[in-house]
Design a protein with these regions (language model features):
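Intrinsically disordered, low-complexity Ser/Thr- and acidic-rich flexible linkers and loops
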Residues: 117-120, 339-347
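Serine-dependent protease modules
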Residues: 2-4, 8, 42-49, 53-324, ...
Length: 409
């Protein structure tokens, strides 16, 4: 079956594995009987997100390509040569041209896992998607695509299969994993875009290994919303996780698509397809690509996954939240918590003097808001980077510099 957060109630799809082999349970999310949906769990459940749509989701396994500007030594630029999100509609390339450009960078991922049953150990297979991010075999996908895998196979668009594949790192907070195909030097990497300039209503394309059977299936749609927060679990009610700052799209994201690319019409990767709403049509979600640029830099430099860490608990401010709690701004990150300190002791934030009740409005001059959630903005950086935060404290604006730490799993 596909290893995904899936929209189907019985989210089980057979792969090419023998019928006697059990399939992996898909991550399932069931919506409540009626809206509004229950809030996702975050560090701040008390204030969190009366405005947040909490949807039970199923993760979707998909693979996509990221065209990075790399030479044979894997020197990589994560800044696109142009902003493909603001291209005028009249000059947008056709979907077919986008697919022609990106398909070689989108791979199918097949995993083997061992499951314990009342009859003993049994082998199960699952399928998802991935994105080529370097010529020498680094692949970006969702963590849930390769979770508990004993073996991983990567299949290119032309059918070439590689079995010498290792999981080189995971970022559980972003549901991201990195794979490495050993012994390759000539893969085509996908081009990484800039998710900070994505517009609601913008046309997008999704590619993935639909149902684990239909390699590089293409769908198209628009960005339906930004800054979504979600809560997801598997079919058994386990594997609960919260995801924030997500893009919402009506481009079809099928079981098996998790880990694949969400693309603008310039053929740039702007998101990683990750989840769909259960019991709904045309509601899929993708992780903004900027949120993983920091860990991507770390992996491409030959290091393990290192996620930048600041050490605060906060609430994303919305206009409704600002009105309810009489906050001075309608957007930003409100440093607050319910029953714990909102600034962790000895953290980078603590050392920089961040205090409970501060409102962070900018990161290195970029406004915190719907298009640029605080976690996504920090996710662009790596440990030891210094960022300047603009904050409101007692009604007065000031700036502080924070040296980011490394998140410890």
């Amino acid at each position: 079956m596909t290893n995904t957060k899936n929209i189907v109630k019985k989210a089980k799809h057979e792969t090419a594995a023998p019928s006697t082999a059990p399939t992996s349970p898909a991550l399932v999310v069931s919506p409540p009987a009626s809206p509004p949906l229950k809030q996702p769990r975050r560090a701040l459940p008390w204030i969190v997100i009366s405005a947040i749509l909490s949807i039970v989701l199923i993760t979707i396994v998909v693979s996509a390509g990221v065209y990075l500007y790399v030479n044979t030594h894997r020197s990589t630029t994560l800044t696109p040569t142009r902003d493909g999100n603001t291209t005028a509609t009249a000059s947008e390339a056709s979907v077919s041209n986008v697919i022609e450009k990106v398909s070689p960078s989108v791979v199918s991922i097949v995993t083997n896992t061992t499951k314990r049953t009342i009859y003993g150990a049994a082998q199960a297979r699952a399928a998802g998607t991935g994105i080529v991010i370097s010529r020498d075999g680094y692949i970006l996908t969702n963590r849930h695509v390769v979770a508990n895998a004993s073996a991983v196979q990567v299949v290119l668009d032309d059918g070439t299969a590689y079995d010498d594949v290792k999981i080189v790192g995971v970022d559980p907070l972003n549901d991201v994993a990195y794979l490495k195909i050993n012994g390759v030097t000539n893969l085509r990497a996908a081009e990484i875009g800039d998710s900070s300039t994505v517009r609601t209503g913008q046309h997008v394309v999704a590619i993935g290994n639909a149902l684990g059977q239909y390699r590089n299936t293409v769908s198209s749609g628009i960005i339906s919303g930004k800054g979504r927060s979600l809560s997801a679990s598997d079919e058994a009610g386990g594997s609960n996780e919260s995801l924030s700052d997500m893009f919402q799209t009506d481009a079809a994201i099928n079981s098996g698509n998790s880990g694949g690319p969400l693309l603008n019409y310039a053929g740039q990767v702007i998101g990683i397809n990750t989840a769909v709403a259960s019991g709904a049509t045309g509601i899929g979600f993708a992780i903004p690509i900027n949120a993983v640029k920091g860990t991507m830099k770390s992996v491409l430099a030959g290091n393990r996954v290192k996620r930048a860490y600041i050490g605060i608990r906060y609430v994303d401010i919305t206009p409704a939240l600002a009105k309810r709690y009489h906050l001075p701004v309608a957007k930003g990150a409100y440093v607050a918590s319910d029953d714990r300190s909102s600034v962790q002791p000895d953290s980078p934030a603590s050392k920089a003097g961040i205090q409970d009740g501060d409102i962070i409005t900018k990161v290195n001059g970029t406004a915190v808001g719907e298009s640029n959630g605080f976690s996504s903005l920090i996710g662009q950086y790596t440990p030891n980077d210094v960022v300047e935060l603009t904050i409101l404290r007692g009604g007065k604006e000031q700036t502080v510099k924070v040296t980011l730490g490394a998140y410890a799993e």
